[in-house]
Amino acid sequence: MKLLTTGKVKDVYDDGDTLVFKFSNRISVFDKIIPNEIDNKGESLCRTSAFWFQLIESYGMKSHFIELIDNRTMRVRKFAVPNKVSLGSSNYVIPLEFITRYYVAGSLYDRIKEGKVKPMDIGLKHVPEYGEKLIDPIFEATTKREETDRLLTKKEAMEIGGLTLEDYCEIMEAVFKIDRRIDMEVSKRGLIHADGKKEIALDRERRIVVVDTFGTADEDRFWDEKEYDNGRVVELSKEMVRQYYRSIGYHDKLYYARENGLPEPDIPALSDDMVSKVSDLYRMMFEKITGQKW
């Protein structure tokens, strides 16, 4: 096998007609790789992703998943990853991330606080609090292959992704359909699915294929349902790590540098105690998301 890429989460190998994903214990936030490794993380992401791929295929949706090789390695179908695509392109990974939001959280909350998103833009007459449920879900697209993810308009997403309006709407419908399945599963085990990301390829007939990973404690935001009903948001995903870096002021320093064209500060390491907590979280979340034993 030939190593193709070493990413923030996994190493990708070319194995002839297929690709092999080897999931690492690396962890990143805000497009920065943290100088710690997290035990259990790679296995949690790999096994959780395999669970979802097998589930959506049982409902007739296509994915690139072929098999689990071991608990941290999976084999997937290969698609082209071109630098530029057009409406005539096929058999390629769309260079976008598709994001669905059901609650006010993450970067949406930041944009509201900064005045970049007005309450009326999301169907509200008041400034929402963190964790407030949206009246209607939000579907967004961001860049995938730029140094930092950039939020796009629908027109920009269609141009960058080589998509027609029909393609874009079909992808949106497919992503919401997947999320309904996620909701059905995780609600059985006391979780709220607050938001998530998906990556999509188009096959040779330009049919939708779900690729990369989804529904894990990395890509998606999960909350404890019982705590939420009692008025408290308890983060059960990588958001716990993002909140840690917000609490120590790193997030504000980083984004100030990005917005003003300054050198970006290095991300500090997590404390040993935090590393242990995050490791336990990934192991626990595999069980709560899938209903399977570790």
Swiss-Prot record:
Its EC number is 6.3.2.6. The gene is purC. The lineage of its organism: Archaea, Methanobacteriati, Thermoplasmatota, Thermoplasmata, Thermoplasmatales. It comes from Thermoplasma volcanium (strain ATCC 51530 / DSM 4299 / JCM 9571 / NBRC 15438 / GSS1). This is Phosphoribosylaminoimidazole-succinocarboxamide synthase. It comes from the Archaea. CDD domains: SAICAR_synt_Sc. Belongs to the SAICAR synthetase family. HAMAP family: SAICAR_synth (MF_00137). Pathway: Purine metabolism; IMP biosynthesis via de novo pathway; 5-amino-1-(5-phospho-D-ribosyl)imidazole-4-carboxamide from 5-amino-1-(5-phospho-D-ribosyl)imidazole-4-carboxylate: step 1/2. It holds the Pfam family SAICAR_synt. GO terms for molecular function: ATP binding; phosphoribosylaminoimidazolesuccinocarboxamide synthase activity. It catalyses: 5-amino-1-(5-phospho-D-ribosyl)imidazole-4-carboxylate + L-aspartate + ATP = (2S)-2-[5-amino-1-(5-phospho-beta-D-ribosyl)imidazole-4-carboxamido]succinate + ADP + phosphate + 2 H(+). Keywords: ATP-binding, Ligase, Nucleotide-binding, Purine biosynthesis. InterPro entries: SAICAR_synt/ADE2_N (IPR028923), SAICAR_synthetase_CS (IPR018236). One of its GO terms (cellular component) is cytoplasm. GO terms for biological process: 'de novo' IMP biosynthetic process.
